[in-house]
From Swiss-Prot:
Compartments where found: Mitochondrion inner membrane; Mitochondrion intermembrane space
Family: Belongs to the complex I NDUFS5 subunit family.
Pfam families, sorted: Ndufs5
Phylogenetic placement of the source organism: Eukaryota, Metazoa, Chordata, Craniata, Vertebrata
Region (Disordered): 79-106
Domain comment quoted from the record: Contains two C-X9-C motifs that are predicted to form a helix-coil-helix structure, permitting the formation of intramolecular disulfide bonds.
Keywords: Disulfide bond, Electron transport, Membrane, Mitochondrion, Mitochondrion inner membrane, Respiratory chain, Transport
Bilayer disposition of the protein: Peripheral membrane protein
Statement: the UniProt record of this protein carries the keyword Disulfide bond: yes
Cited InterPro entries: NADH_UbQ_OxRdtase_FeS-su5
Annotated protein name in UniProt: NADH dehydrogenase [ubiquinone] iron-sulfur protein 5
UniProt short sequence motif Cx9C motif 1, positions renumbered to this chain: 33-43
Amino acid sequence: MPFLDIQKKLGISLDRHFMFLSAEQPYKNAARCHAFEKEWIECAHGIGGTRAKKECKIEFDDFEECLLRYKTMRRMHDIKKQREKLMKEGKYTPPPHHSGREEPRP
């Protein structure tokens, strides 16, 4: 507990916005990972941190992938490497609009 709680005196709560993405949003639009966070919170609710790490690992991994997109980025990197490899071998020619040579617009 801080000696001087400025957030409470000013009536704001910055921490609340960093806790849950599924908290009430200003324009009622759900966050991108709302469904995954909700599943994880429902799974972990009331069972304690130690059990939740074991029993809710699948839900947490889904939520983490939605937030960080590390598998998606790895897949995109692999696709880009494969495309560059095929271009060097001469087996793939990208369409003109992918190389910056698109048709002039009227």
